[in-house]
Amino acid sequence: MGQAYDALPSEVYKDGELKGKIKRLMGLAAALTHGCRACILFQTEEALKLGASVDEVLETCAVAISIGGTMAAGETTRVVQFLGEKGLV
């Protein structure tokens, strides 16, 4: 059971009908609406590694804000700060 659980992320986020990049952006939107700080940074980093542009990341943040309201808006500042630290904005 433990091995199957450990393998889950690599299976879920690999390219399928949806590209891994899109899945990571979806994960970012979910993390923003749930306020999971570590997840927000992790999903942002992984999406960038898979070729997401800064504009795609920020558009994902906008979608999350439309769903999660002020909580997602507040958490979006973490993404902007992270992108700034990477010299991307």
Model-predicted segments: where are they?
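Immediate flanking context of iron-sulfur cluster ligation sites
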Residues: 17-34, 55-60
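Acidic, glycine/proline-rich low-complexity segments that act as flexible tails and inter-domain linkers
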Residues: 1-22, 72-89
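A short structural micro-motif
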Residues: 32, 63-70
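Short, flexible active-site-proximal loops enriched in glycine and acidic residues
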Residues: 51-58, 72-73
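Iron-sulfur (Fe-S) cluster-binding segments and ferredoxin-like electron-carrier domains
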Residues: 2-4, 42-54, 80
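Short cysteine clusters
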Residues: 36-39
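Amphipathic alpha-helical segments within well-ordered protein domains
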Residues: 9-10, 27, 44-48, 62
